[in-house]
Amino acid sequence: MTAHSLIDAIRAAAPDLRGRLLENQSLADLTWFRVGGPAQVLFSPADEADLSAFLAALDPSVPVTVIGLGSNLIVRDGGIPGVTIRLGGKAFGSVEIDGETIRSGTAVPDMRLAKAAAEASLDGLAFFRGIPGSVGGALRMNAGAHGGETTDVLVEVRGIDRKGEVHRFTHAEMGFRYRHSSAPDDVIFTGATFRGRPGDREAIEAEMERVTAAREAAQPIRERTGGSTFKNPEGGKAWQLIDAAGCRGLIRGGAQVSEMHCNFLINRGGATAADIEGLGEEVRRRVREHSGFELHWEIKRIGVEASPA
């Protein structure tokens, strides 16, 4: 089915949709690597009710992919077939605080969540200042940094399944472990409730400044990068294993292993998604051969490879 006919079918099934539907929309500008092919159809729902109606009407055979800020993501050069959903706007991008309870939309950047908590003198969420993604991504992978993880402060998650039905997941039902949650893959997270603890605003903001300084000193944040590439294996640190295998500065096409922090891949300019993913696989191979450790991707890779020329 072509993008145009898919959109026609969606509009026929859900004529009252209020969100934006775009066909063959480039995704490169929506990822931090600035690479990747187009979304066959990109949908940005107006609010939760709009998303629910869309999913309820969508043919279940049409694949659905969800993206956030694109900071921990490689979109392959052939693009993403089916429907890609990107949440945004006030409906998914607001933060509300009531006492020690923080309610956030899943399109909220993690750094803004940390700032909002600090402004309310709520401690425990400063680590989010060091995570360059959105709340939705943090929920999906139990994101963490600088000694804190999402699981430490989460109370409840709200989401919608492929049938358009709304669900709530308790902390226990999320099944968090290191860089992973056990929530159903077909659920799109729309909101989350966190709990902070009373603290001193100046001390919290000082901790956030420390997190920011540590990140700027150790990570290539001014480069086009997707963030931390591989999970730390049990008994080792990914960057040390990569360095020991001689991969610091390794180049493939327009992609390079960062000289500054070798668990980061960067787009030097003109890289393709295949360059970046291929470089990552070469790093995995060299680490395996050098130390026996198997590195697993932390960066999510989605879409299809480009067709041969």
Swiss-Prot record:
Its EC number is 1.3.1.98. It catalyses: UDP-N-acetyl-alpha-D-muramate + NADP(+) = UDP-N-acetyl-3-O-(1-carboxyvinyl)-alpha-D-glucosamine + NADPH + H(+). Pathway: Cell wall biogenesis; peptidoglycan biosynthesis. One of its GO terms (cellular component) is cytosol. The keyword Cell cycle applies. PROSITE patterns: FAD_PCMH. Its cofactor is FAD. Pfam families: FAD_binding_4, MurB_C. The active site is at R179, S228 (proton donor), E298. It is found in: Cytoplasm. Residues 34-221 form the FAD-binding PCMH-type domain. GO terms for biological process: cell division; cell wall organization; peptidoglycan biosynthetic process; regulation of cell shape. Belongs to the MurB family. This is UDP-N-acetylenolpyruvoylglucosamine reductase. It comes from Methylorubrum extorquens (strain CM4 / NCIMB 13688). The gene is murB.
